[in-house]
């Protein structure tokens, strides 16, 4: 499933209109995202948003933030590469992740 379809399906399960959901998601400056921006996200016309918006979408749509980050194809800030991990440790983490998804 694409990021947009996950957002759209979850919004519909919660019986929210795009306008209602958009009004609940606030940018860093405190203003709401526009319904058009949300529509573009749902139709995969825009790249998934930043962590600030992803966290709010997860909360409003009752999705785990981990799943939403996964379908967005990004990492939460606490997992973003800092360049301090060895290549072997990173490879082991990805192998463990793949094994967990295959179960």
Predicted features, each with a name:
Residues 1-16, 23:
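A short, Lys/Arg-rich alpha-helix, primarily the initiator
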Residues 2, 33, 89-92:
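Alpha-helix N-cap/N′ positions at the starts of helices
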Residues 7, 18, 35, 54:
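Helix-turn-helix DNA-binding elements, focusing on the entry/boundary residues of the two helices
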Residues 21-25, 57:
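Short alpha-helical "recognition helix" segments of helix-turn-helix
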Residues 26-48, 70:
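Recognition helix of helix-turn-helix/homeodomain-like DNA-binding domains
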Residues 49-67:
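DNA major-groove recognition helix of helix-turn-helix/homeodomain DNA-binding modules
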Residues 73-103:
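Interfacial/linker helices and their anchor residues that mediate assembly or domain coupling
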């Amino acid at each position: 499933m694409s990021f947009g379809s996950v957002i759209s399906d979850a919004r519909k399960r919660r019986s929210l209109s795009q306008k209602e959901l958009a009004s609940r998601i606030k940018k860093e400056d405190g203003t709401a995202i526009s319904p058009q921006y949300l529509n573009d996200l749902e139709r995969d016309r825009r790249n998934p948003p930043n962590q600030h918006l992803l966290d709010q979408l997860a909360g409003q749509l009752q999705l785990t933030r981990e799943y939403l980050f996964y379908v967005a194809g990004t990492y939460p800030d606490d997992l973003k590469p800092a360049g301090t991990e060895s290549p072997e440790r990173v490879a082991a983490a990805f192998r463990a992740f793949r094994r967990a998804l295959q179960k």
